[in-house]
Curated annotation (Swiss-Prot):
Protein name: Glycine/sarcosine/betaine reductase complex component C subunit alpha
Record bears the keyword Oxidoreductase: yes
Source organism per UniProt: Peptoclostridium acidaminophilum (Eubacterium acidaminophilum)
GO molecular-function term, one example from the UniProt record: glycine reductase activity
Secretion signal span: none
Location of the active site: 359
Amino acid sequence: MSDIKQMIGKTFMEIADAIETGSFAGKVKVGITTLGSEHGVENLVKGAELAAKDAAGFDIVLIGPKVETSLEVVEVATEEEAHKKMEELLDSGYIHSCVTVHYNFPIGVSTVGRVVTPGMGKEMFIATTTGTSAAQRVEAMVRNALYGIITAKSMGIENPTVGILNLDGARAVERALKELAGNGYPITFAESLRADGGSVMRGNDLLGGAADVMVTDSLTGNIMMKVFSSYTTGGSYEGLGYGYGPGIGDGYNRTILILSRASGVPVAANAIKYAAKLAQNNVKAIAAAEFKAAKAAGLESILAGLSKDTKKASTEEEVKMPPKEVVTGTISGVDVMDLEDAQKVLWKAGIYAESGMGCTGPIVMVNEAKVEEAAKILKDAGIVA
């Protein structure tokens, strides 16, 4: 009987919330891990409490140490435990999206940041800000454009404009995207604010928010995020914008958004709202549909054409992958262009290795007990210093 009463009570609460918010869609739950901030646990808790004050259609779950708060808390003691619990709660469906700090994504997944530009106060998505979409720069930026489009559409922009920051490879990216568009995948190209126009963007266009989606490589995007979020504070406290955004990738099914260790209360609050909206609008379904449409327009052959002329001819024997094992140890200092070589060097030496991307750059992941040996092998091979 008590279970029935609880069910009835929950139903009436949901109806009351729906009447109050005007939305009869089910509530989503957004998690946030509270360990890892340079400003302390209370910084992220305050951000969550700020987001909860005007939360529309979502609840917030804190993942971290016990604190005095009215919000739900799932207790963990360390960052590693927090990330494991976050993954467990996401995979079980208990939470629908999560905001966290210092999380490693696999190669192929990158995050799309969201900022407010100072020129006109316009919001802009920066694609991308952490992670590596591909080892080859131009291919990565083409994928980044798709990730930005997916995220912007998931936030309610039906036809987001796309600009390409004027970096090495920008023209090749532009050609690839225009070929994709010509094959039937709809892309609306932005126009530079400068007199000569075009979809390749200048610094002026960054400040003015000339594009809904600004395409860049992740390292440049990461710097841009830090400038946009902390130019008023001197750098140690990121107080503006919505954080580094969700990890997007083909077949990636967790909605995980990234904060910097320097992100302050307002950014944490905004990141939670960002995460809620993505979950409410079903970013995973939108991503699946966009990847399907892009592939139908020849994405894979376009990407293969980009790398055809840049791949080194290889006369080396095929390196066999050693048996898989748990890889929790990390080795940093590897250039993104050398990740594949690093992995093969270790495989050849009989050490199972995977590549990934940490918040500070590319990493090679090996078994904890083999980190020292693997690091020496990579150093001897000239891959790390």
